[in-house]
Amino acid sequence: MLYSRSVAKINGVSARQILDSRGRPTVEAVVSLSDGALGVVSVPSGASVGKNEALELRDKDMNKYGGHGVTKAVENVNSIIAPRLVNTDPFNQKALDDLLIELDGTDNKSRLGANATLAVSVATAKAAAASLKLPLYRYIGGVASREMPVPLVNVINGGLHADNGLDFQEFMIMPIGASTFSDALRMCAEVFLSLKEILKSNKLSTNTGDEGGFAPNLESNDRVFCILLEAIEKAGYKPSIDFALALDVAASTFYDGKIYKFSGSSMSSAEMVSYYEELVKKYPIISIEDGIAEDDLAGWKELTVRLGKKVQLVGDDLFVTNPRLIKDFSERGLANAVLIKPNQIGTLSETIEAIRLASMSNFNSIVSHRSGDTEDPFIAHIAVALNCGQIKTGSMSRSERMAKYNELLRIEEDLCGTAILRSVKIGRH
């Protein structure tokens, strides 16, 4: 992303505190250029957080927003970042992000806050794209950007994302039989609606969790899988052919350092892997995210050895979108796919580098939202720009989730028939 022929410079950088989908404050940044181009970006926030994520700076003033305010991060943009960026080149993203990293001066963005640096980083890219009259995905990725992502749609919420008895955080459907993104989205919406009818007919709650999926009180994971298969068939589709299932276990949330405790059971790492093997035999599950806790590296190794050729094993808390960790753990044979959350690392350039390193290791990359999100659709552009092939951005409800899906529909239309939707490859390829 180096467009040297433009003469526009950054002439304004500012930030404000707005609210995310959970009613908690987050950062919105505004970057303006000398030619009148403008970039406005707001950043998300997670509930299930990896311990190695870049720091999301919060005020910790318990008298306001329960300590979740971000006025310090906003002030860092307005008083520290803005003066250094005014009159600089907005088209050299790497140089701009390197400056943000230098201004912060820490390993985890703890001085300025990753919420501050990411907002400014992506807002600058958005302003630069506007200056060149390009969509953001085209500005970031160039002419080769045309692969639409297969959506992993979260239809049942559990864990930290819902107030029900399910320990696993997300139960997702993947429209593996779709030929276009618009078809994929339609198929998912139809299954989502049929699932709602099934839950109602069983007198189960159709209230939704943080990410828009239903949050019924179900007695077991097996019950969830059976209901999902019923919903797929009720919508007129075939499990394993039209749809597969995916999980976000978020195993770190029920791991005590030695044992996994969930659903009234206690399991070792080896027993967890055996449990997943049984699930994969019984149900069309092709993707498991954070099936092992981030600190249980031996467990990750065993999971990868035993299931890595059959199932997409996604590291979220394990990698936290950190290029160094992706390189290290991929070389050690842990996982076979990386979840990409830009706010875990704090700049657009580092996000791009994380995806590049994943690709070099023959890992899939899945671009992801966070449970506390905004209506900003920039991750949709990142997914297409870098031909990631998969996106995880919630369910078929809540407008902050639908904003990403609707933006992908616009991008597919903008590609004028050149867009492709590839099948999901499993394992290192």
Curated annotation (Swiss-Prot):
Location(s), subcellular: Cytoplasm; Secreted; Cell surface
Cofactors (names): Mg(2+)
Lyase as UniProt keyword: yes
Signal peptide per UniProt: none
Residues annotated as transmembrane: none
SUPFAM superfamilies on file: Enolase C-terminal domain-like, Enolase N-terminal domain-like
Primary location group: cytoplasm
A molecular-function term among this protein's GO annotations: phosphopyruvate hydratase activity
Top EC class, one word: lyase
Reactions accelerated catalytically: (2R)-2-phosphoglycerate = phosphoenolpyruvate + H2O
Manner of cofactor binding, per the entry note: Binds a second Mg(2+) ion via substrate during catalysis.
Keyword Hydrolase listed: no
EC number: 4.2.1.11
Cellular component, GO annotation: cell surface; extracellular region; phosphopyruvate hydratase complex
Alphabetical keyword list: Cytoplasm, Glycolysis, Lyase, Magnesium, Metal-binding, Secreted
Superkingdom: Bacteria
Record-stated family: Belongs to the enolase family.
Designated name of the protein: Enolase
Organism: Anaplasma phagocytophilum (strain HZ)
Gene field: eno
